[in-house]
Amino acid sequence: MNADQTLLVLASASPRRRELLAQLDIRFTVSAADIDETPHAGEAAEAYVGRLAREKAHVVASRHPGAWVLAADTTVALGAELLGKPRDAEEAQAMLTRLSGRTHDVYTGVALAGRHEETLVVRTRVTFRALSSGEMSWYANSGEPLDKAGAYAIQGKGGFLVAGVEGSTSNVVGLPLGETVALLERAGLPLPWRAS
């Protein structure tokens, strides 16, 4: 597909990122990148999500010459510990137990490749309520946490876990919209609100 047909390619399989980007009425297609998402030893959360977003963007840009390629990656950090996606309900409950009653950071790396190269990382601080074992067990077994960094979806059932958010809520969902729009504007992407 050439750049005239598709100006922006979203390098993500995440339905949440697709939904967030679609809210902006920006025309795009999706082409997921399959990369190794294992953190490097001692890699900080900011460096980790920035690296993964860049790698995803470059893999997909090689398949779509001439297009802008947008990629993102999100992780939850509790101190230096990175909390990715739980493998099962038991691991989800263990993550929720660690997050209960505490403040953690959600980092999303956003990278643009192809016509414009730039990477940014956005941090949002999220505080969980003190959760009962029953709440954690119910939520962990609901199925919702299994494909979510940190084992929760703030935009879904998991919203009841949260006592407060400092920063971008869309960042916690997987794509910080304000920062992403600013990035696309800097790149010169034709956006719906710009005069033709």
UniProtKB/Swiss-Prot annotation:
One of its GO terms (molecular function) is UTP diphosphatase activity. Nucleoside triphosphate pyrophosphatase that hydrolyzes dTTP and UTP. May have a dual role in cell division arrest and in preventing the incorporation of modified nucleotides into cellular nucleic acids. It is an enzyme of class 3 (hydrolase). GO terms for cellular component: cytoplasm. The record marks 16, 74, 155 as: Important for substrate specificity. Gene3D superfamilies: 3.90.950.10. It catalyses: dTTP + H2O = dTMP + diphosphate + H(+); UTP + H2O = UMP + diphosphate + H(+). The active site is at residue 73. The lineage of its organism: Bacteria, Pseudomonadati, Myxococcota, Myxococcia, Myxococcales. Belongs to the Maf family. YhdE subfamily. This is dTTP/UTP pyrophosphatase. One of its GO terms (biological process) is nucleotide metabolic process. Its main location: cytoplasm. Signal peptide: none annotated. It holds the Pfam family Maf. It is found in: Cytoplasm. Its EC number is 3.6.1.9. HAMAP family: Maf (MF_00528). Keywords: Cytoplasm, Hydrolase, Nucleotide metabolism. Its cofactor is a divalent metal cation.
